[in-house]
């Protein structure tokens, strides 16, 4: 379903894009667009302005596809790990997929991906803590139980708290004796003591940035 909702592209023998097909349901091997583009700033501004005065709003369909004969648009082949994140469900699913064997290696490979750096202490696992099949960034403090979850940097899981099948973003705090399952939190979320939050794999609970529940 994700493939069908993406753009397909047709190329000539020189990898020049000659056609963009939006929401096309063709079967078989196809060239799937990743919707990543490198373009000169002034050219982009000109194209957006021209589309705006005409009431056009979609970049691929209304700007690129309409100007393929005028623009020199080429494709670069990428055979690595690709995930389409378009809503909360797909965001949750793709994070959970990182916990599967081989997914991390497929994503990063031998070449590192450099992101914003915030040097922090290594994650601390205190006495009585339990962590299974999870991916934790640095700066976390774990006193409770974490299973099948992705924790961003600086998360704190207090004593007696149980976290399962969750994606917890930066500096999320789960207080003692909480039980959270199938939950996605934004940054700086505070889950108060003895709280129970339970979603499902098809409809995870989302807690917005900075909220306390």
Predicted ranges, named:
Residues 8, 36-38, 204-206:
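Conserved hydrophobic/aromatic beta-strand scaffold that supports enzyme active sites
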Residues 35-46:
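Conserved nucleotide-sugar donor-binding
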Residues 2-5:
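Short, small-residue-biased leader/transition segments that mark boundaries at the very start
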Residues 11-28:
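Short, flexible, basic/aromatic active-site loop/helix in glycosyltransferases
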Residues 26-36, 79:
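A short glycine-threonine-serine/GTX helix/turn-capping micro-motif
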Residues 10, 38-40, 84:
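Short, well-ordered beta-strand micro-motif
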Residues 9-11, 75:
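A structural signal for short hydrophobic beta-strand segments in well-ordered beta-sheet cores
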